[in-house]
């Protein structure tokens, strides 16, 4: 059992005493129930933890007793290249950890991870595939509002996280976006049994200070202090950094996540929200700068609108469609196809417009 005692108060720069520096980003608002989703690439390195989770910040309410504890965890242990750690923690620090096997290395590429939290169950997903379902008595005690959090830190638990070497540093976790869906119990359009509907998403194009705050704290078992400089917004990503005290911040190439930092081929990622009403975003990644055309067609193959036609820079771009035709008219509800053409490749994706 991994016991983590958070020390959220009385931590100042004067008291920084840990040998390493980590980072944490958290929402200002708290949430009760919903679907919590992230697209990210975790940090490699034995002894290194990167995360996406929710936590009831009882310290900020003036409580010190762990009887108020509620937490739902997705954690990546950098020692593994084929596993993900999930956990539930309720009052008095009762936890329910589990390690799940996955078919890829989460430290090498971006994938989508999510958990659904309702009054009836908590479920964890990797690339929309269910990996864990919990509907026992833990769910009855998981009712307190929680903040969305992401952090990177160095664990002192060798048994759990593995042995650590300073030569691992610096190491980084990359976050592409976060989405929050309301739980609407069968009346939504996303998640299990359409139980959820998208409320907001953040693409990390910048630091939305009305939504997120950077944390400065630590806890027993965490060998790093969280500092503002190790939460970096760059090139459409939020990057969490684990560093030495003398090399804080992000010192890598933001466009070289694999060595190149870019996908190995031209890619059109999943459009979101999909279905949509108002505006849909179509993420595109290119290995190198090249001409790109993105057109919308209906199910009869009729041309609707050109969204992009011209030279596109290497890296990641997001192309939006507001549901208007090339003539400025509102397209009717229905199925449409986004067709993206590059120098040597054509990719088509179905999108659904609902009004």
Go through each PLM region and give its residues.
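Flexible, active-site-proximal loop/turn residues at the rims of small-molecule/cofactor binding pockets
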Residues: 12, 58, 184, 313, ...
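C-terminal outer-membrane/trafficking sorting elements
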Residues: 260-272, 276-355
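Sec-dependent signal peptide recognition
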Residues: 1-8
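Hydrophobic h-region of N-terminal signal peptides that target proteins for export
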Residues: 8-17
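GH16 jelly-roll
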Residues: 18-254
């Amino acid at each position: 059992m991994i016991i983590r005692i958070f020390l959220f108060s009385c931590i100042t720069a004067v008291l920084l005493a840990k040998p390493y520096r980590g980072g944490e980003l958290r929402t200002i608002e708290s949430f009760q129930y919903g679907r919590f989703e992230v697209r990210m690439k975790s940090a490699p390195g034995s002894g290194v933890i990167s995360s996406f989770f929710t936590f009831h910040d009882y310290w900020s309410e003036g409580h010190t007793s762990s009887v108020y504890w509620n937490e739902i965890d997705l954690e990546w242990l950098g020692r593994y290249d084929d596993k993900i750690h999930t956990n539930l923690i309720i009052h008095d620090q009762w936890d329910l950890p589990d390690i799940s096997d996955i078919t890829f290395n989460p430290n090498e590429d971006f994938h989508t991870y999510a958990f659904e939290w309702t009054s009836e169950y908590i479920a964890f997903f990797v690339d929309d595939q269910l990996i864990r379902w919990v509907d026992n008595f833990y769910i009855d005690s998981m009712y307190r509002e929680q903040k969305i959090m992401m952090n990177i830190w160095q664990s002192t638990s060798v048994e759990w996280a593995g042995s650590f070497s300073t030569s691992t540093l610096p190491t980084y976790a990359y976050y592409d976006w976060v989405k929050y869906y309301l739980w609407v119990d069968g009346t939504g359009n996303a998640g299990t049994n359409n139980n959820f509907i998208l409320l907001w998403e953040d693409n990390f194009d910048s630091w939305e200070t009305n939504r997120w705050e950077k944390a400065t704290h630590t806890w027993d078992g965490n060998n790093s202090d969280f500092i503002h400089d190790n939460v970096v917004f760059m090139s459409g990503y939020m990057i969490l950094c684990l560093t030495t005290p003398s090399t804080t911040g992000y010192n890598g190439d933001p466009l070289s996540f694999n060595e190149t930092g870019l996908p190995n081929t031209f890619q059109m990622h999943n459009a979101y929200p999909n279905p949509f009403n108002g505006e849909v975003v179509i993420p595109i990644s290119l290995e190198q700068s090249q001409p790109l055309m993105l057109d919308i067609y209906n199910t009869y193959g009729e041309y609707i609108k050109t969204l992009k036609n011209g030279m596109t820079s290497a890296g990641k771009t997001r192309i939006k469609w507001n549901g208007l035709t090339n003539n400025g008219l509102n397209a009717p509800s229905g199925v449409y196809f986004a067709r993206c053409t590059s120098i040597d490749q054509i990719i088509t994706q179905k999108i659904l417009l609902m009004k």
